[in-house]
Amino acid sequence: RKAASFYSKEQIETICKPVFGSVQLGECLKQYCGDAEAQIDFCGVCTGICVISNVMIAKAFVPEERVCVIEKACACVTPESHRTAIEAMKTCQVDIQ
């Protein structure tokens, strides 16, 4: 909630998703990014499932935008699976911070 306080209510979109990836996220990104240059940051609990799924959706819907993953704000089932997911995203031109 504290991070959200930096943004006006018009800039906050809550997406409820019953599965790992969210097409609704991609549609929202496409709508909000428009012609303006944007950076989209991701973090999450499961790097190898939820994070990578949504990162790839973002890359598909807004391929020209900068998509970043905050590595230290992510985790996975094992350290090895976390590293594997991070390396896979690097290969797909995702910036790892």
Identify the residue ranges that each predicted region occupies:
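Active-site-adjacent betaalpha module
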Residues: 1-97
